[in-house]
Amino acid sequence: MLLYKPYDNDAALAYARRWALSRNPLFYNFSGVGGDCTSFVSQCVLAGSCVMNFTPDFGWYYRSVNDRAPAFTGVEYFWDFFTRVPAFLRANGGIGPFGRAATREEVTPGDVVQLADAAGDFYHTLLITAVREGELLVSAHSNDVYNRPLSEYDAPQKRFLRIEGVACAGMIPSCFAGLYTGRRLPFS
């Protein structure tokens, strides 16, 4: 039986503030090989959840550059994991952070936005890190930004992900300090 705990938006935001403009040495920098955006957002969400799902192919985890789930670093796979697409949910048992598609008005700092081109291909993942005078501010890697207005991105399509909680098999110790300081991956 799974237990549910709240997602810690504040921890995700603190992590983003610390690492948006630099790199945590615990994680490979994918900027030169497809982009580091989804990895960075995954790191932020991990800081706010401390739960990974180690199911090969359909999980959400990072141990090393060669031992990671596609959802930790891939835009579409990230969305499918978090929105619990049936194939993912059947394969991975639902452990880990989860969310749902949301409107712009429903998201808050700590939630996620993804950008698509005119053909509808989603290519960029960003963390919402603030709201100022009604404007969503985002942080991301690849082109490193912290609190950049979302309106400055020229993307024909956007989709929003509201992170609703974290499913776990038992009590989870905090991972924040080791992750935030770049000293230790959770459960490693």
Question: Predicted segment positions?
Answer:
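N-terminal capping segments
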Residues: 1-76
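Feature targets compositionally biased, intrinsically disordered low-complexity regions
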Residues: 31-33, 58, 73, 92-98, ...
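Short, solvent-exposed loop/turn and secondary-structure capping segments
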Residues: 54-57, 125, 150
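...with weaker cross-activation on analogous glycine-rich loops/strands in unrelated enzymes
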Residues: 62-138
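Short, exposed beta-strand-loop hairpins at the edges of beta-sheets
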Residues: 118, 150-151
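Low-complexity, Gly/Ser/Thr/Pro-rich intrinsically disordered linker/tail segments
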Residues: 137, 141-142, 151-188
